[in-house]
Amino acid sequence: MRQAADPNDRAVAAALPRRRTAEFLAGRSLLRHLLRLTVPERASTPIRADANGRPLLDGDPATGISISHDGLAIAVAVGRGQRVGVDVQLPAPHVPDSLLHRCLGRHAQDVIPLSEHRRGVELAWVWTAQEACVKAAGTGLTGSPWSIDVPPGSREGQWGGYRWISLRDRSHTPLSCAFSLSRFPSDADGLEATCS
């Protein structure tokens, strides 16, 4: 997969703080790789951000894209004819009860008795599903991801017009994708979402 960075991506990276450049280019490189596999005609399309910061393929609103990184973990998603969101999260070593109550709501009592490590892991899985949903919706944190009901241990669910999937059987690092249940108005050939 190792390829030279896309010229458009290098230009954007040049304006970023030095500490963010490598992370940014790694995320864009993985996204470009997934685009080459799923929508090859869009692999070199410039990427811009909408008013809320959501990445979009310039001139192609019908192909949803999403990028997430946490530390060295990177995840991307592409949806033909769909809005998509992806989130990857490294578990925190310590999770206060107040954060569990905030993000898990009525399910917090199921996680509080767990070991510190398991609490961090389970919160990370729940958070990735919540965050993937608001990324797909294009609202980010203003969409109050912590208010989305994701029961601990869940592998899939629905929130509004979005379906989310946690890749618990495929990833050791908490990773979830969300995608719209309805199509973008376009001439896209059916619905298809891919998460990597």
Model-assigned labels for residue ranges:
Residues 1-196:
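Core catalytic alpha/beta fold that binds nucleotide/phospho-ligands
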